[in-house]
């Protein structure tokens, strides 16, 4: 029985789809003005694992993740670069897809872009105006009337009265209330804009997601996800817009993943304390980065550090060493391990608990390989199958172990040195053999001489 923590109710609930076996999930995606940082990677990987598990459980899942391709940050960066905004966004979208592929992230079923849904935004805004939830003061802007929506604050547990304390209307804004937020922004000189019933302009951020989600999944759907920094105001405002416009409940369950932190602060571009996925992948194998992101529960924060990445590498080394050198085999039944793995994942997608089951499996594989190679191989196949549900341990063990965490060793150079050492040993040139071994050790390479020849791996 799958249970998920619903931010809306602040409780763990038994998951029941709205319609039969169908699950419709929308996740807030990237604002594509720069390369993805590791915090974005955390959200991508978290909902990738959730997607894999829902499908494994037999649900008919439709996964939608949007792209915000018009925004103040995009306009500012394009102006800084001296390029059209859509040239910038196309380049960043391509880079995002490359990062995802390297982290073994499955593609969403749909990936709508905000600029493809302008007409839908006009329609929802007009509906909100007609119902009295929005107003156009005549300056080209359109605002949402927060005080009219009785349920405002129900996701984030904020009270409108408390939010008004200290709130103020900025110069140039034509709001009725400091809490009102923009649905449509009147055009400014030199900015991209679209025609609308209220004049040239562009959409506000919040209306984009309300329109894209309901367009792709319907007025009501099962799961809405994103980083926990989006809970307020973005997701709160989405609920206010969508439920006022449709008169129906918006998303049944809200899932929020924790942040990547550095020294206790959220990793973010605005704070300048971020590492792009690309920068991290220059030093660490993609699977090391992915494992770091799944080793903790998706709602927990992850502290970014070199030490934590090295620990992730060491964990994967243990797994791949358990899988190494075993023949192909059908997966063992391993009912107890399978049931405990499933119990962890059914408990709000508890990947940390699932990984602990994988470690127990790896220990048992290592124990069995000394006495029953076929049983070890079958259990290893089950280990690989379960790990695949988390998107890890699908490489050839030797390939991963030789690639290492940092990828700075040239495999061809290592193989050439090993061959030279074998030739030195055959010629009984022990001094040369030892010199080559010392050279390899200095490179971080560990040699393992066995009956089948010499294999190598990188030191932990």
Curated annotation (Swiss-Prot):
ATP binds at residue 269. Its cofactor is Zn(2+). GO terms for cellular component: cytoplasm; cytosol. It is an enzyme of class 6 (ligase). It is found in: Cytoplasm. A motif ('KMSKS' region) lies at residues 266-270. InterPro entries: Cys-tRNA-ligase, Cys-tRNA-synt_Ia_DALR, Cys-tRNA/MSH_ligase, CysS_C, Rossmann-like_a/b/a_fold, tRNA-synt_1_cat_dom, tRNAsynth_Ia_anticodon-bd. GO terms for molecular function: ATP binding; cysteine-tRNA ligase activity; zinc ion binding. It holds the Pfam family DALR_2. One of its GO terms (biological process) is cysteinyl-tRNA aminoacylation. It catalyses: tRNA(Cys) + L-cysteine + ATP = L-cysteinyl-tRNA(Cys) + AMP + diphosphate. Belongs to the class-I aminoacyl-tRNA synthetase family. NCBIfam families: cysS. This is Cysteine--tRNA ligase. It comes from Pseudomonas aeruginosa (strain ATCC 15692 / DSM 22644 / CIP 104116 / JCM 14847 / LMG 12228 / 1C / PRS 101 / PAO1).
């Amino acid at each position: 029985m799958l249970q998920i923590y619903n931010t809306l109710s602040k409780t763990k609930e038994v998951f029941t789809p709205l319609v039969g076996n169908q699950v419709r999930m929308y996740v807030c995606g990237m604002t594509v003005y720069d390369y993805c940082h590791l915090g974005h990677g955390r959200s991508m990987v978290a909902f990738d694992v959730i997607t894999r598990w829902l499908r494994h459980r037999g649900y008919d899942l439709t996964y939608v993740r949007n792209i915000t391709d018009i925004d103040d940050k995009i306009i500012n960066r394009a102006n800084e670069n001296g390029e059209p905004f859509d040239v910038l966004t196309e380049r960043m979208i391509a880079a995002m897809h490359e990062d995802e592929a390297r982290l073994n992230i499955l593609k969403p079923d749909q990936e709508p872009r905000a600029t493809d849904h302008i007409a839908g935004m006009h329609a929802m805004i007009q509906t909100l105006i007609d119902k009295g939830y929005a107003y156009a003061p005549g300056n080209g802007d359109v605002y949402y009337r927060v005080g009219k929506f009785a349920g405002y604050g129900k996701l984030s547990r904020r009270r409108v009265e408390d939010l008004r304390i200290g709130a103020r209307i900025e110069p140039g804004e034509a709001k009725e209330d400091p809490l009102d937020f923009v649905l449509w922004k009147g055009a400014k000189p030199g900015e991209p804009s679209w025609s609308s019933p209220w004049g040239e302009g562009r959409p506000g951020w919040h209306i984009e997601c309300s329109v894209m989600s309901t367009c792709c999944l319907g007025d009501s759907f099962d799961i809405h996800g994103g980083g926990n920094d989006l809970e307020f105001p973005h997701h709160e405002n989405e609920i206010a817009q969508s439920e006022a416009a449709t008169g129906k409940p918006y998303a049944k369950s809200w899932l929020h993943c924790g942040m990547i932190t550095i020294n206790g602060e959220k990793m973010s571009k605005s704070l300048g304390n971020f590492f792009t996925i690309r920068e991290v992948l220059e030093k660490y194998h993609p699977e090391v980065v992915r494992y770091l992101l799944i080793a903790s529960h998706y709602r927990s924060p992850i502290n970014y550090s070199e030490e934590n990445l090295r620990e992730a590498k060491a964990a994967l080394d243990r797994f791949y060493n358990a899988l190494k050198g075993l023949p192909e085999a059908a997966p063992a039944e391993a009912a107890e391990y399978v049931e405990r793995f499933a119990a962890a994942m059914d408990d709000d997608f508890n990947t940390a608990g699932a990984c602990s089951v994988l470690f127990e499996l790896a220990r048992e594989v290592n124990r069995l390989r000394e006495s029953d190679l076929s049983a070890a191989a079958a259990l290893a196949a089950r280990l690989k199958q379960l790990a695949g549900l988390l998107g890890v341990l699908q490489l050839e063990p030797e390939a991963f172990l030789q690639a290492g965490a940092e990828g700075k060793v040239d495999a061809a150079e290592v193989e050439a040195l090993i061959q030279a050492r074998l030739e030195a040993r055959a010629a009984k040139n022990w001094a040369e053999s030892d010199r080559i071994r010392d050279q390899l050790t200095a490179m971080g390479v560990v040699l393992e001489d066995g009956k089948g020849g010499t294999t190598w791996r990188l030191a932990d």
